[in-house]
Amino acid sequence: MRTVLTAAATAALIAAMASPAVANSKDEAGTPSSNAAGAATSALKVNERNGSFDLQSHRGGRGEWTEESLAAFENSLALGVTTLELDTHLTEDGKVIVWHDDTIQAAKCADTAPATAGDPEFPYVGDRVAELSLAQIKTLNCGFVQLPGYPEQDVIEGNRIAELKDVYQLVRDTKAAKVRFNVETKVESSQIGGAGMDSLTRAVVAEIQASGMAERTTLQSFDWSSLNLTKEIAPELPLVALSSGDAWMGVGQPGASRNLGGIDIDDYDGSLPKAAAAQGYDVVSPTFRSVTPAMIAEAHELGLPVIPWTVNTIADMERLMDLGVDGIITDYPTRLRTLMAERGLKLPKAYEVKG
């Protein structure tokens, strides 16, 4: 079992995760404030105690560019974000791709041609990712239409679904030495705690370790059994406990929860921070609507940063920052970066990307 972090250690972890850029443009981004450890208490907001704040670009900034596209991640690097947040699935032939949905949806992707002549599985739209090979998935045009509900989204024409290793290579090519990765194992609901979870988790961990950037990567999941397996096979990786709220965790419901790796949340007073700390996780990432001052105070007391998802309006960003969250996952990284600048927070380094 991991040792629970002290408040000082929490501040250091948050500063390392946020990797803020210093005001002097000649300096490299990411030097934590020297007063972080000495000033850290659960009563202090992270943006007051060390100036760091984790700006996470959700799916590469879904509100601004075609989600999970390499172009979106590249644009996020050019903008200047702390963390690239992304989802992973496993193809039929064992390749880790960066995509959110279990099935290929017509609202996002269109068939172009079969991967091989006469492929009996063609067309592929509507099929499960787990039942398609990488070659089949690569034929899909997943950049042809603006996603409904995101009127500011720029369509990345002809986008092809990327592999996880491609995102790491992009960051390597860009020499984005301070940007971090928050990688989600997107376990299908039917596979929670099962064989599908196991194979996906092992494949994702292997890709992270092969990237040479494991020290800049956190692994997150709504299937806490995936976190537990990661803790066993890669104890060096920080783990992020995702939560969709009390009902999802099973608060007040009898018995153990499949979502939570077989624990009963009521054994931890219905508390996300208490449950996550007891399991040895490093960060809590609740839905933003469930965040309360009490949750933040409890999490910080237990040594856990709080990074809610998915926060898209300025009003919600301001409210959560005032409460003292340690970062925000957003579809609109430009909005959050602008707000951080207005508040005098140190901004993540913006990188020059190849045109």
Model-inferred region functions:
Residues R2-A9, A15-G355:
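Phosphate-group recognition and catalysis centered on beta-loop-alpha active-site segments
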